Structures are given as C-alpha cells and as structure tokens.
C-alpha cells in the first residue's frame, strides 16, 4: 500500500511539473506572439546629444510607429557604457529593454577587468544601425589649420596638451588612442560623461582636441565654433568633403569607424530578436531615415544577428591590441 501510494504521489508530482512546464511554455509563446504589448526602452549609455543617442533617436520614432508601441530613450551614461550594458544584460530577456551602444562596447572588456557581465555570453547583437565618422576638432582659437599643425604643437610639448572623450572606453576614446599610437604623440586623456560636455570644453579652450562623432559636431563646425582637421574613416565624409581623412593627413593606419548597434539579453527568444532585427532593417531602408543619417554623415550598416556577433568578436580583438599597446586601464 505504501509503495502504491508513493508511486501515485510521484506520478501526480510528475504530472504537475509537466503541467507547469507546458503552462510556462504557453505563456512564453503567447508573449512572443503578442510582442510588443507595452513600451519598449532603448538604453543609451551616453548623454543626450551624443552620437550614439542621435542615431538611436533617428530610428526610434520609425520603429515605434511600426511596432505600435512607444520607444522610450533612456540615457544611462557612465563607465564607458558599462553601466547601461550591465543593466540590459541583467534585465528580463523579453525584448522590452534594449541596449543601443557604440563600438566602445568592444573595448570595455579590455580595460575594465571586473565587468558585471560577459560581453559575448550575456548580450546578443541584433544588428548594427549605422557607421559614422569621428571628426578631429579643435577650437578655432588654437590657430591650427591642419593635422600637421596640431601634431607639431603636441610634439613640441609632450604630455602637456590634453584631449577629450565621451568617456573612458567610449568609441571616441578608442579612436583617440589609436590615433596617438599611430602618430607617436603624448597627450593627457580627459573623459567626460558624453559628447556634448566634451565639445563644450573644446569650444571653451579647456581641452585641446577631440575625436567627436560627426553627427554631434557638424552643426558646430558649420557655425564656426569648431575647426575640423580630419575625419577618422578611410574615405572622406560626404558631409564634409573638403576635410581630409587622418590617413590623408599623414597618419598612416589611423583610420577608425564609429558604429552604433542594437543588443539584447542573450536569452531573448529568437522570434523577438528577428522582429527587432527586421524592424531596424525596414527603418534603414526608408528614404527619410537614409536622409537623416546622410545629413549626420552616417551610413546604414545592416547585418544579420549572426554576422554582427561575429563582427563584435573581431572588434574586441582589435580593441584589445590597442588597449594593450596604449596601457589603458579603467577604474
């Protein structure tokens, strides 16, 4: 009797567990089928007005209309983007909390040894959104008309001039470090919370130079508040065709591309990842989005999730080499 009762109990327990499992699976399937049924949040790890923020906002409105739900931009600056990345990595993998990060995402593992998340295992790339140049800008008051002028002044006072970035480990920081290594110069790094703050200090003459996202710096260049010396990409920008590349300006191997991409927690269901990917690709194909990106000096950068995640690993390897050569360490 005892054995029979025990068997019945085990059978009932197994049926209960099976029922719970089926119910949970049904809930997940329902959630995916009805996605999205509430606002979606884009976590941007830099301040409003930064290059990453501008690109995120360019596609957010279009995606919001297509999804039928608000897409809210939440700026979470700090620690080179690792604060926002950590928050997204630890969020529910349901497609409602999304990271819109820059190429600095690939550098952070090399300079922050104790990240609270694994860049590859905890976050899954959906697609890059856009690639854009950084532009080397200085205050017109400096009197530097070319990269050669700036390099001459820097080499004449090694370690005395400074340069701004949008934060330790940001794409603007990595760009500057690569340029420094290739140019053979010494300068002091001054990190800020975001691009607008860094630009303000360069305009005010408190910082000597800055590789700023072209999307943020372009209006200030056109207004004469900043002098553009070179763009970071291998080819000139259509937005500033008269401005040479850093390679054309004489610093070989200094080209750098600032990309902005979308990532989600790695456990996010594949159908939701596909939906988000498809929405971005649709947005990038629209003439209005292409026009906005073009005016920012940016270009659409569509990729499949698989290609994007492979690309991130390649970028991590390249960033690690720069970080090691430059001796970069985060706090």
What residues fall within each predicted segment?
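N-terminal secretory signal peptides that target proteins for export/translocation
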Residues: 1-11
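An extracytoplasmic/periplasmic, membrane-proximal ligand-sensing/linker region
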Residues: 2, 37-39, 181-183, 270-331
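Bacterial N-terminal signal peptides
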Residues: 13-25
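Sec/Tat signal peptide C-region and signal peptidase I cleavage site
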Residues: 25-31
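N-terminal (or domain-start) structured segment
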Residues: 31-121, 160-162, 184-211, 300-303, ...
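Hinge/capping helix and adjacent helix->loop/strand transition within the periplasmic-binding protein
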Residues: 90-96, 110-197, 209, 246-248, ...
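A ligand-binding cleft/hinge motif common to bilobed small-molecule-binding domains
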Residues: 105-114, 178-182, 209-243
């Amino acid at each position: 009797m005892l054995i029979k009762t025990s068997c019945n109990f085990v059978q009932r327990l197994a049926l209960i567990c099976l029922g719970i499992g089926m119910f949970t699976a049904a809930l997940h399937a329902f959630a995916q089928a009805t996605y999205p049924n509430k606002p979606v949040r884009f976590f941007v790890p830099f301040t409003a007005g930064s290059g990453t923020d501008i690109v995120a906002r360019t596609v957010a409105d279009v995606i919001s209309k297509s999804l039928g739900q608000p897409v809210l931009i939440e700026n979470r600056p700090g620690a080179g983007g690792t604060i926002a990345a950590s928050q997204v990595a630890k969020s529910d993998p349901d497609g409602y909390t999304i990271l819109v990060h820059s190429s600095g995402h690939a550098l952070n593992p090399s300079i922050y040894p104790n990240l609270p998340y694994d860049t590859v295992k905890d976050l899954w790339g959906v697609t890059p959104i856009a690639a854009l140049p950084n532009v080397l800008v200085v205050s017109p008051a400096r009197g530097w008309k070319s990269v050669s002028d700036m390099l001459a002044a820097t080499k004449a006072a090694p370690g005395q001039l400074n340069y701004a970035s949008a934060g330790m480990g940001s794409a603007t920081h990595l760009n500057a470090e690569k340029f420094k290594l290739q140019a053979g110069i010494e300068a002091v790094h001054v990190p800020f919370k975001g691009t607008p703050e860094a630009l303000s200090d360069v305009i005010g003459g408190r910082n000597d130079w800055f590789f700023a996202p072209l999307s943020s710096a372009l209006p200030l260049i056109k207004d004469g508040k900043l002098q553009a010396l070179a763009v970071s990409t291998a080819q000139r920008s259509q937005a500033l065709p008269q401005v040479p590349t850093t390679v054309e300006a004489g610093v070989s191997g200094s080209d750098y591309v600032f990309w902005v991409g979308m990532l989600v927690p790695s456990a996010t269901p594949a159908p939701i990842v596909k939906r988000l990917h498809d929405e971005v690709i649709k947005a990038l194909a629209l003439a209005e989005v292409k026009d906005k990106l073009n005016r920012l000096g940016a270009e659409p950068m569509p990729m499949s999730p698989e290609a994007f995640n492979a690309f991130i690993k390649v970028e991590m390897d390249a960033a690690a080499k720069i970080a090691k050569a430059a001796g970069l360490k985060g706090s």
